[in-house]
């Protein structure tokens, strides 16, 4: 029953990570085109300008990783304090801004800032709220619910490179940025309309007192404890499979 009630939150998280799968590889998959957009001469692969263009893209990728690194430590604490919905919305909004930046900027520095922000959006916002959200929405099998995140990241990581080749060969490489931009807007809409189990429990806890408040808090603690349940062998196998 709980899984049905919070089905939209599960769909929201999975779609967000389908989008994240593209964000994770968008710079490397479109490196030459991005370098051209940022003002580098990419006509001769043997030239210093070509190498500088690729280095600029690599720098933006590195800033994405740095954004993940600096935000991963505090995202969980913030998520527990303000709830899952706000961080899912914030992450989607940041993704929209980042993809807009990638689409229009002609400056490598601005692109690096966008890369950093997308890293923060992923680890500081979505990882901190999305991972626990799917487990709380499906407490009967939290480990299995979590596997869906890895699955959708892998799906977009497999499909997106084919889109890159197709769009680039047809002269429409910017579609490679427009597609995840539109997906990010869908993520924002889903995050706004979806109910989240933790948020509902938190509101109920804040709106009651005495024994009722204790009961709601006990339900929240039980949901957190369920997420620490040792996964089955099949779940462990899938995690190892997608990790390597």
In which residue ranges do the predicted regions lie?
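Helix-loop junctions at membrane interfaces in 12-TM secondary transporters
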Residues: 104-114
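Cytoplasmic helix-loop-helix junction between adjacent transmembrane helices
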Residues: 114-151
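Extracytoplasmic
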Residues: 8-42
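Conserved MFS/SLC helix-loop-helix module at the cytosolic interface between two early adjacent transmembrane helices
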Residues: 70-106
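MFS 12-TM fold signature
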Residues: 64, 94-99, 183-187
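Residue-level signature of mid-helix packing/kink "hotspots" within the transmembrane helices
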Residues: 25, 64-73, 158
């Amino acid at each position: 029953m709980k899984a049905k009630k919070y089905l939209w939150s599960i769909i929201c998280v999975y779609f967000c990570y389908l989008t994240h799968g593209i964000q994770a590889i968008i710079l490397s998959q479109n490196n030459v085109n991005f370098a051209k957009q940022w003002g580098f001469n990419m006509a001769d692969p043997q030239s210093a300008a070509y190498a500088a263009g690729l280095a600029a893209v690599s720098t933006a990728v590195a800033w994405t990783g740095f954004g993940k690194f600096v935000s991963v430590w505090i995202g969980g604490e913030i998520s527990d304090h303000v709830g899952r919905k706000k961080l899912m919305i914030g992450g989607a909004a940041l993704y929209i801004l980042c993809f807009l930046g990638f689409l229009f900027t002609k400056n490598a520095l601005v692109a690096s800032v966008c890369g950093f922000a997308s890293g923060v959006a992923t680890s500081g916002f979505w990882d901190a709220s999305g991972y626990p959200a799917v487990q709380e929405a499906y407490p009967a099998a939290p480990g299995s619910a979590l596997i869906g995140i890895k699955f959708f990241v892998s799906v977009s990581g497999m499909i997106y490179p084919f889109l890159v080749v197709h769009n680039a060969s047809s002269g429409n490489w910017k579609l490679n940025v427009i597609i995840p931009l539109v997906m990010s807007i869908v993520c924002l809409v889903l995050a706004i309309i979806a109910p989240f189990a933790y948020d509902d429990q938190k509101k109920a806890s804040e709106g009651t007192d005495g024994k009722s408040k204790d009961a709601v808090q006990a339900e929240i603690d039980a949901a957190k404890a369920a997420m620490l349940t040792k996964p089955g062998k099949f779940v462990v196998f899938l995690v190892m499979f997608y990790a390597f």
